[in-house]
Amino acid sequence: MLATPTIESPEEAARRAKESTLLSPRFYTTDYAAMNAIDVSSIRAEWDAMLAEYEGDNNHDHFQRTPEFAQEVAERFSQVSPELRQEFLDFLVSSVTSEFSGCVLYNEIQKNVENPDVKALMRYMARNESRHAGFINQALRDFGLGINLGGLKRTKAYTYFKPKYIFYATYLSEKIGYARYITIYRQLERHPDKRFHPIFRWFERWCNDEFRHGESFALILRAHPHLISGANLLWVRFFLLAVYATMYVRDHMRPQLHEAMGLESTDYDYRVFQITNEISKQVFPISLDIDHQAFRAGMERLVRVKTKVDAAKARGGLVGRLQQAAWAAAGAATFARMYLIPVRRHALPAQVRMAPAW
């Protein structure tokens, strides 16, 4: 595997955050008129209860650093290897970009709609994502690598997504984010000696924000049944596979990050998939068969393809570009074969909302 490119300056951190690749977090824009037309009257009781939870803001005091934070960084993180340092910094840059992406999207929606239900929801979620992004960025500043988030908002490319794509992708992003954070938190709770950075102490209450955000999109989707039935299930299937595959490949580019926490990347990812599959039964009548032999083989092949693409890119020149194109085509073919693997089907529960019980 090629060495992870180093992040040693704020300029490199900003460049990494602005990247637009298949694996990097993106910034989105959407159809605000369609967002304004969202109708949640069919799930009004659950919706109002959820907004009351946002109003209660049980994490309002959570994203504050303790006096011991910087001291723990100095004592514990100084002992990590250069390779782990770079993988962790890459994780922080990717995470702050992802959190800020949600902040930007939700804020733009709330500014461009009049629908009071949508406006209130987006304002609350933008508030939460702003806290998350700011907390991660503060951790980057400890290394002199803080990112100018205002500049990132102005200069990073935006991708247009129809509202239904926003719902599918963001629901899954929030729920898989919960599954990732809670799995890491539980692991380090059992093995505190492997907590090499204090930010992981915040993950339990933090991931409950992610879970609640996902609940919001679950309610929207269940209030519009046509989005989770018929031909739209083909899109659900696509986004399930795309989100899982992106996570799997990205995580396997950071093997030392998981190893340092006492996790193995493949085992960790399938635990996250399992949790996300269970959660997503609240809204999707299908789930990926993550135990299917062809699914697991396909994931491994996508990792190999990514390594080959990176090697071709590093080679450069005409030959390198041709190799990149060939391996990209191989990756697309692998994804297509995985898309055709039979899915598991199940009935939707009468009650939409769930508790974060993992």
Swiss-Prot record:
Record protein name field:
Aerobic magnesium-protoporphyrin IX monomethyl ester [oxidative] cyclase
Taxonomically, what lineage is the organism? Bacteria, Pseudomonadati, Pseudomonadota, Betaproteobacteria, Burkholderiales
Q: Required cofactors, per record?
A: Fe cation
Function noted in UniProt: Catalyzes the formation of the isocyclic ring in chlorophyll biosynthesis in aerobic conditions. Mediates the cyclase reaction, which results in the formation of divinylprotochlorophyllide (Pchlide) characteristic of all chlorophylls from magnesium-protoporphyrin IX 13-monomethyl ester (MgPMME).
Question: Is Lyase there in the keyword field?
Answer: no
- According to its UniProt record, the EC number is 1.14.13.81
This protein's source sits in the domain of life called: Bacteria
Which keywords label this protein?
Answer: Bacteriochlorophyll biosynthesis, Chlorophyll biosynthesis, Iron, Metal-binding, NADP, Oxidoreductase, Photosynthesis
**Gene from which this protein is expressed:** acsF
SUPFAM superfamilies in the record = Ferritin-like
